Every structure is written in C-alpha cells, then in structure tokens.
C-alpha cells in the first residue's frame, strides 16, 4: 500500500511535472521550427530550380540553326535590315526565301566561305555597290555562309568558326551582321589560306569593330561554336542536295575553269565560291558583265514592265 504523499512531496511532484511539460513544449516548438525551416528551404530550392531552368532555356539557341537563317542564309533588305525568320529546327528542311521576280527588289544570293580568296576579292569589288542597292531597297541580298575550306586553316577550322561567329551575330545582334560580313571579307581582316586564321577572340574583336557588343552570350556562342553543325549542314545541302530558290530550268556552272553547265535533270550543286545567284539564275563574271551592270539590266527590265503595266491599266480605265 502506497504511503500518502506529504505536502512537500506533492509540491515537488507538481514542479517536476511542470518541468517535464515545459521541456516537451520546447521540443515540440523546436521540431515545428525545423519542419518550417525545411519547408522554406524546399520552396527556395524549387524556386531557384525554376529560375535556373528559365535562365538556362533563355541562354540556349532557338534551335539547331540560328534565328533569321531558316534558308541556311540570312537576307538583308531595305536599310540593311535582316529579314526575320524562325530558327531551323532539328530535322527541318531549309526553306528558300520568299521571292517575286516579277518586280523589284532584285534578289541576289551569295554563297561564301570566309577563307575563300575569291570571296574576298568579290566582296572588295562589289561590297560597297551591294550595300548601296540593298540600303535603297533595290536589292535583297542573301548571304549563305559555308565551310568547305576548313582544311586550309592548319587544323583550326577557321571557315566553320568564322561562319559560326557570323551566325551568332545574325541571331543576337542582326543590326550589325551586314557590317560584320563585309569586315570578315575585307583585305585588312580576311586571313590567307594555309594560315590558322583569326582566333575566337579576334573574331569577337572584329565584330565589335563592326559595331557589335561583346556580350557574354555572343562570346560564348563564338567559343562554343554553337552553330557549327548548322554550318556543316549548309555545305552538305549546297554541295549534295542542291541550291534552293533557283528559277525553273536554271543550270549552274559545272566546272568554273571550263564553263560547262551541270545536267539539267540533276540537282544543281555548288561547285565553287563565291557563287552568285540573281533572280534565280547564276551570274558568272566574264560571261555576264559586271554584277552591277547585270543587276541594273534586270532592274530596268522589271521597272519597264511595271511602267507598261501601269500604262495599260490607265488606258483600260480611260
């Protein structure tokens, strides 16, 4: 039989029970704080994860190809503005620019390799003229960068790196792409064959000299050769599948040294650079006169047709 507790013992027992209750409450509060902190931490981690994903996605290229080059090339129109296009997605075929050869502007497409000496000579002879006519809206110029001379840069793949840098700028800072294209082919900048070509840093420096900003995104795009696969596919498309946007029945030169034409019933493949297409037909230096004369002849014919159409319309209305 338990002895009856004294008053002091009952007091001590009550104190002990109160102490145990306080400790239990403290442990419960601590446990709740840990749960709360853990929950907040999980929320923070989740938010950071979303932010990181958004940032990562924003830094990725819009597709395997750059923006504004869905044909494989970039088209410059009036005031040297780039014609906007979506990026070429993986598995998609290149799409020729929309063309209407019944009226101006005249369409000029140039296939170039930035290490090609003849491309440099072509640009030095015709660059200012094309800039004038594109700026005025008389010509739309499409530049199609290639890399078939990679083997001429002592292992650095300069043609790919230069074409990639150009493509990076077309996507990120298109307002400076025309000047950059001209600069890469200028006598002061274009490297000779059998040299290593410009370094990646020098490619960025020359973009800045052409008016671009040396943003982290641009420099990373150049360094990573983000669009190298796109440039590789450009060469494969032009040299194997055949050129896009040719006029019906148009034939390209087969051997530039001879001047013979490719078979009409086969895809018209690129044989050399620069290859220049004007309103769907190849312009050949030495056969067709100067490029400016050739463009003005076509422009004159189109303007004459337009004027006659206006006269006929006016007579019919009268």
Describe each region flagged by the PLM.
Residues 57-112, 126, 135, 306-318:
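Extracytoplasmic low-complexity, Pro/Thr/Ser/Ala/Gly-rich segments
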Residues 111-113, 144-147, 183-185, 278-281, ...:
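Active-site-proximal beta-strand/loop segments in catalytic clefts of secreted hydrolases
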Residues 120-208:
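Structural alpha/beta surface segment adjacent to cysteine/selenocysteine redox centers
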Residues 3-44, 50-62, 208-318:
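C-terminal cap of thioredoxin/glutaredoxin-like
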